[in-house]
């Protein structure tokens, strides 16, 4: 069997960059990683809890969360496709989220600064597309229709290629299987090719389904 490497780690330092940017002493490194995970989980839980599906977008997805740390400051930049939830009340939601994160990580000497960046073409991001597919599957839409619609949305976002894979008890089948659809080019072995990738798990009435998406942007 082929040994498949993570496309993001394979391109780290060329077309992909780190999502956590800070330095620490070796003995403190694990604490810093756990703190980053707490921040990301806290933000995602807050947005999921307060999420209101808007009629124009159908999803309020987080593309990625970047964390930069200084001695007295933690800067968190959230890249979102549809940030209506966090910006519709001015700065109130963001200030509330900052307080929740600060309490979660028990940060007394460091200030939390959260900023929102809107993605111009949200459906060109695999995380947002995966969330869209998960929403369609939970609404009992056929998985083939859900994947086809996701591919159409990705093509409208000027992507050069996309591959979508779903694994699990599809349509309630007794045996788990893996199905995928592909459109355009997805050159996984070319390091200079800018490829985005995500893994997403969705819980359905038949059990868990795993969604994997590869998107080829440009050479």
From Swiss-Prot:
The keyword GTP-binding does not apply. Pfam families: Ribosomal_S3_C (PF00189). Keywords: Chloroplast, Plastid, Ribonucleoprotein, Ribosomal protein, RNA-binding, rRNA-binding. One of its GO terms (cellular component) is cytosolic small ribosomal subunit. InterPro entries: KH_dom-like_a/b (IPR015946), KH_dom_type_2 (IPR004044), KH_sf_prok-type (IPR009019), Ribosomal_S3_C_sf (IPR036419), Ribosomal_uS3_bac-typ (IPR005704), Ribosomal_uS3_C (IPR001351), Ribosomal_uS3_CS (IPR018280). One of its GO terms (molecular function) is rRNA binding. One of its GO terms (biological process) is translation. Transmembrane segments: none annotated. CDD domains: KH-II_30S_S3. Residues 43-120 form the KH type-2 domain. It comes from the Eukaryota. The keyword Ribonucleoprotein applies. It is found in: Plastid, Chloroplast. Part of the 30S ribosomal subunit. PANTHER family: 30S/40S RIBOSOMAL PROTEIN S3, SMALL RIBOSOMAL SUBUNIT PROTEIN US3C. NCBIfam families: rpsC_bact. Belongs to the universal ribosomal protein uS3 family. This is Small ribosomal subunit protein uS3c. It comes from Oenothera elata subsp. hookeri.
